[in-house]
């Protein structure tokens, strides 16, 4: 009996790339297909669907400058990665290779193209990332989380399907928890997160914003905040002095459940975060990461802001006074919080993993009879 077709999932080594790949992998395995992950060494830190036995690490390099030395280093690493990926394709013979963005996806997708293996890229951002943009003209098909991402290019738009962002089972479970607005005198559960690049600004601004809230709000507040180890002491000192009910951690392994139990979220606006806020349906205050060439986080936050589901604050406007003002206004208006939660849910797509799996099967040309639905 021949083994089931293999789908190779290629993703950069951060959660924003890995989590959608994991969510798709779960659905493909439920359909009786085999999956493997191709990524860079950063992904080995994540626990999840992909064990080390299911993961192949391919050399790659992010473009970090335009100097001749930087470009030569990047080119050499991508060349070495592509050679290794070609060997991998020859050995594994995947039915299709699916990319989820990040420079580590370039070698496997280029190798698949050279070997005439069907390819697809998925992009979760409102503005397509640079690696996916480079690959988009060469792949068999494109999937996006949001509509209209490639409307300015008719050739790319013609092979693009809007699927949404695949969600892990933990997110789908959290999405089943309905939003319950805070009672006027009851607890106000505030979740503050920002990822490795965003937690520093949250540590700089949020404690001083909390200081400016009323004593009544201090008594109501149940605060959960992601804080880097190096910022922990100074943040804790402020909250201890205010006698708050708070919890600080550098990383929350149960973040989906934390999102589900929150009344309001303060966060960066990476594609994964925005998609999870939409799927679970929670109001948010979003602070896009500045300086990105494509301003992708600004555009991502704009999707929820346009749906009246989030308040978007540029980092130069993200001051303690501004944040305190927004928290105070929302805490006094549970009806607005409820409307924001509903607006977020209106953006979310809970069936995205199934929709993307359908597209993968189509691109790979896998007959329905070869699959076994579990």
From Swiss-Prot:
Name of the top EC class for this enzyme: transferase
InterPro entries: GlcNAc_MurG (IPR006009), Glyco_trans_28_C (IPR007235), GlycoTrans_28_N (IPR004276)
Similarity comment: Belongs to the glycosyltransferase 28 family. MurG subfamily.
PANTHER family: GLYCOSYLTRANSFERASE, UDP-N-ACETYLGLUCOSAMINE--N-ACETYLMURAMYL-(PENTAPEPTIDE) PYROPHOSPHORYL-UNDECAPRENOL N-ACETYLGLUCOSAMINE TRANSFERASE 1
Keyword Transferase: yes
Gene responsible for this protein: murG
Membrane-topology annotation of the record: Peripheral membrane protein
Biological role stated in the UniProt entry: Cell wall formation. Catalyzes the transfer of a GlcNAc subunit on undecaprenyl-pyrophosphoryl-MurNAc-pentapeptide (lipid intermediate I) to form undecaprenyl-pyrophosphoryl-MurNAc-(pentapeptide)GlcNAc (lipid intermediate II).
EC number: 2.4.1.227
Pfam families xref list: Glyco_tran_28_C (PF04101), Glyco_transf_28 (PF03033)
Top-rank taxon, per record: Bacteria
Catalysed reaction, written as an equation: di-trans,octa-cis-undecaprenyl diphospho-N-acetyl-alpha-D-muramoyl-L-alanyl-D-glutamyl-meso-2,6-diaminopimeloyl-D-alanyl-D-alanine + UDP-N-acetyl-alpha-D-glucosamine = di-trans,octa-cis-undecaprenyl diphospho-[N-acetyl-alpha-D-glucosaminyl-(1->4)]-N-acetyl-alpha-D-muramoyl-L-alanyl-D-glutamyl-meso-2,6-diaminopimeloyl-D-alanyl-D-alanine + UDP + H(+)
GO biological process entries: carbohydrate metabolic process; cell division; cell wall organization; lipid glycosylation; peptidoglycan biosynthetic process; regulation of cell shape
Listed GO CC annotations: plasma membrane
Subcellular location: Cell inner membrane
This protein's name: UDP-N-acetylglucosamine--N-acetylmuramyl-(pentapeptide) pyrophosphoryl-undecaprenol N-acetylglucosamine transferase
Pathway stated in the Swiss-Prot or TrEMBL entry: Cell wall biogenesis; peptidoglycan biosynthesis
Predominant location: membrane
Naturally occurring in which organism (per UniProt): Rhodopseudomonas palustris (strain BisA53)
Binding locations of UDP-N-acetyl-alpha-D-glucosamine: 14-16, 125, 168, 196, 297
Keywords assigned: Cell cycle, Cell division, Cell inner membrane, Cell membrane, Cell shape, Cell wall biogenesis/degradation, Glycosyltransferase, Membrane, Peptidoglycan synthesis, Transferase
Molecular-function annotations in GO: UDP-N-acetyl-D-glucosamine:N-acetylmuramoyl-L-alanyl-D-glutamyl-meso-2,6-diaminopimelyl-D-alanyl-D-alanine-diphosphoundecaprenol 4-beta-N-acetylglucosaminlytransferase activity; undecaprenyldiphospho-muramoylpentapeptide beta-N-acetylglucosaminyltransferase activity
